[in-house]
């Protein structure tokens, strides 16, 4: 990451800029609350009530994996991919090195004379690729069939094996150096192994040793990151696990990735130093110009070179004044990747759906220049394209999330009001709606297709969602979150996650019959349906949810009431209408009781009752407002058509 205090030129003329005191993020990008109320009751990032499940003629709860995969991989000439660089071909995790003829050591620096797969066998079968040495790669190849894992680990280990072997005397050292020279990213990475910075073309034994040690340390740190994630999220879905695995591959290869940009190489025009940052340009060069490197690494590079994914890692781990000083710059470093795995990676299918929608939204506006736009965008909106206005909206929403995160530092009310007004205008703009409703599904499909392993995981999860297996897993996770302060499990996150994943299916598989959330619920065993209904009674008919929310430190009664209503709406999206109607009076009575029993609640009641003394519900309650999808970056939402 590069640190810059210079805001986007466009923003200064569009809305008053927040001060550094307002810009402080305590939560990752997709977790920031981007609504004025700041309330949200679900575990997933999608706010219920803004994504509707339209009825379909779904005839069963499962689609075959092969048919879904076929729908996902089907090429579509009508899809626009102008905002995503499509030069990078799909890379198989088991891609072998180039099959060109064996090169002599003196010609090995020419990529056209790259070592073949059989040439690399001297590394794969050496003492430097022993079972003990390969253990560090096990978490990164665990997704592969058992018979493929050892070879994939050997390919990932090649840079380390080559560096150690090149320090020997004799023919093996020459072969190892030929391999290093044939792979430009590896050559530059070894060149700067000891002292970093400038590649001078002089590779010493100290450089070789330092590089090998750096790679081993990076891989070991990646293992720790994955282990921590697995410990914290034992019920993570296949898609989220695949994202974490891919991120771990990148984390383990950071010494290579940071050196992959062609501008870092000896003799490059406009030569730059290796500075610990990774860019999309560097990742694309790693894929295209390094025939001896692992196919698994290239597949990971292909994924993280996508603008939407790269942007999410760019700011991972930044908080407080570091966040305030940082402008998104489309580069990341090792600490960003570790922080993303440990703290920002999705933990369930609903969070994955939100993350993918956010990434697709960013992809949709990547490369759209708004640096010369100003307030005319709002005063004369017809003069600008939907793409331009969408790019401005996303930029404002990114600013908005930082401002909201800085509420504890100062009063941000005026700044938020200005942002909210501008964002609302763009959200309601038909051109913006039309552009994003077309481009986001296209970009979601493009992002999933960028990695064949992710594609497989998405198809597997779709089957889990439609069968109800994913819902049951998320319900079990919610049960484990119960403690003395929160004695009643909250299943609203599991239900909103279900809705988010079904919406994602509609985007990814436009020709498939996708069930509604209520259809999935109705196909669950009686004990699952009863479990959710009983939870509704405890949380809403008996007031448990509101009681827990009001009991939290620094809780606001109005926001607590809104959050409880959001949670209630999630349950009601799947429960039978006659059951919900039968609980309505109990809900009203318990809500009034909990508010009256709380000092915060009593204060709220003074301003929230009408002349007859009846409680007046928040006007933005999902139970009362339209369920149309809104464009809201950070929650995976957009306007439906």
Curated annotation (Swiss-Prot):
InterPro entries the record matches: HrpK (IPR031613)
Biased amino acid composition, Low complexity: 44-121
Record region (Disordered): 1-127, 598-628
Transmembrane segments: none
Annotated Pfam families: T3SS_HrpK1
Compositional bias ranges of the Basic and acidic residues kind: 603-614
Biased composition (Polar residues): 1-20
Protein name per Swiss-Prot or TrEMBL: Pathogenicity locus protein HrpK
Species of the source: Pseudomonas syringae pv. syringae
Top-level taxonomy: Bacteria, Pseudomonadati, Pseudomonadota, Gammaproteobacteria, Pseudomonadales
């Amino acid at each position: 990451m590069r640190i810059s205090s210079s805001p986007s030129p466009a923003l200064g003329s569009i809305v008053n800029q927040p001060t550094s005191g307002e810009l402080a993020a305590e939560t990752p990008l997709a977790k920031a609350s981007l609504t004025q109320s700041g309330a949200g009751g679900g575990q997933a990032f999608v706010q219920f009530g803004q994504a509707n499940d339209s009825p379909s003629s779904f005839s069963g709860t499962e689609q075959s994996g092969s048919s879904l995969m076929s729908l996902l991989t089907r090429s579509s000439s009508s899809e626009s991919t102008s905002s995503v660089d499509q030069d990078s071909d799909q890379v198989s995790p088991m891609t072998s090195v180039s099959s060109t003829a064996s090169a002599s050591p003196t010609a090995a620096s020419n990529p056209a004379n790259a070592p073949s797969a059989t040439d690399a066998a001297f590394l794969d079968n050496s003492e430097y690729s022993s079972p003990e040495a390969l253990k560090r790669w096990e978490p990164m190849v665990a997704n592969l069939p058992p018979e493929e894992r050892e070879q994939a680990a050997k390919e990932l280990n090649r840079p380390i094996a080559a560096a150690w072997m090149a320090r020997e005397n004799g023919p093996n050292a020459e072969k190892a150096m030929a391999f290093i020279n044939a792979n430009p990213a590896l050559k530059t990475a070894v060149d700067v192994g000891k002292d970093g910075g400038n590649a001078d073309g002089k590779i010493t034994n100290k450089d070789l040793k330092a590089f090998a040690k750096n790679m081993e340390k990076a891989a070991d740190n990646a293992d720790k990151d994955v282990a921590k994630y697995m410990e914290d999220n034992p019920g993570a879905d296949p898609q989220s696990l695949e994202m974490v695995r891919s991120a771990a591959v990148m984390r383990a290869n950071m010494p290579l990735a940071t050196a992959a940009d062609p501008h870092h190489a000896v003799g490059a025009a406009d030569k730059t130093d290796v500075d610990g940052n990774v860019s999309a340009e560097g990742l694309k060069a790693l894929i295209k110009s390094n025939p001896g490197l692992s196919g698994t690494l290239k597949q990971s590079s292909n994924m993280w070179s996508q603008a939407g994914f790269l942007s999410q890692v760019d700011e991972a781990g930044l908080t407080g004044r570091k966040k305030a000083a940082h402008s998104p710059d489309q580069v990341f470093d090792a600490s960003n990747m570790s922080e993303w795995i440990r703290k920002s990676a999705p933990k369930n299918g609903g969070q994955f759906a939100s993350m993918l929608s956010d990434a697709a939204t960013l992809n949709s506006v990547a490369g759209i220049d708004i640096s010369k736009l100003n307030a005319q965008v709002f005063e004369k909106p017809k003069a600008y394209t939907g793409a331009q206005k969408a790019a401005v909206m996303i930029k404002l929403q990114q600013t908005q999330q930082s401002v909201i995160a800085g509420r504890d530092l100062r009063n941000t009310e005026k700044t938020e009001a200005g942002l909210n007004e501008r964002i609302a205008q763009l959200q309601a703009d038909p051109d913006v709606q039309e552009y994003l409703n077309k481009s986001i599904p296209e970009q979601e499909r493009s992002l999933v297709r960028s990695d064949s392993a992710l594609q497989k995981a998405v198809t597997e999860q779709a089957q889990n969602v439609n069968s109800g297996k994913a819902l049951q897993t998320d319900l079990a996770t919610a049960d484990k979150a119960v403690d003395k302060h929160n004695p009643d499990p909250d299943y609203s996150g599991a239900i909103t996650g279900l809705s988010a994943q079904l919406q994602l299916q509609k985007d990814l598989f436009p020709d498939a019959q996708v069930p509604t959330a209520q259809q999935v619920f109705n196909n669950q065993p009686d004990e699952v349906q009863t479990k959710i209904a009983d939870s509704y009674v405890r949380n809403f008919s008996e007031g448990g949810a509101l009681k827990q929310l009001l009991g939290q430190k620094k809780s606001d009664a109005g926001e607590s009431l809104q959050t409880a209503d959001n949670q209630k709406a999630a349950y009601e999206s799947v429960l039978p209408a006659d059951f919900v109607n039968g609980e309505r009076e109990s809900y009203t009575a318990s809500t009034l009781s909990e508010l009256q029993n709380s000092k915060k609640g009593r204060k709220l009641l003074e301003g929230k009752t009408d002349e007859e003394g009846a409680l007046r519900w928040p006007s933005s309650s999902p139970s009362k407002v339209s369920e149309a999808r809104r464009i809201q970056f950070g929650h995976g939402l957009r306007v439906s058509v």
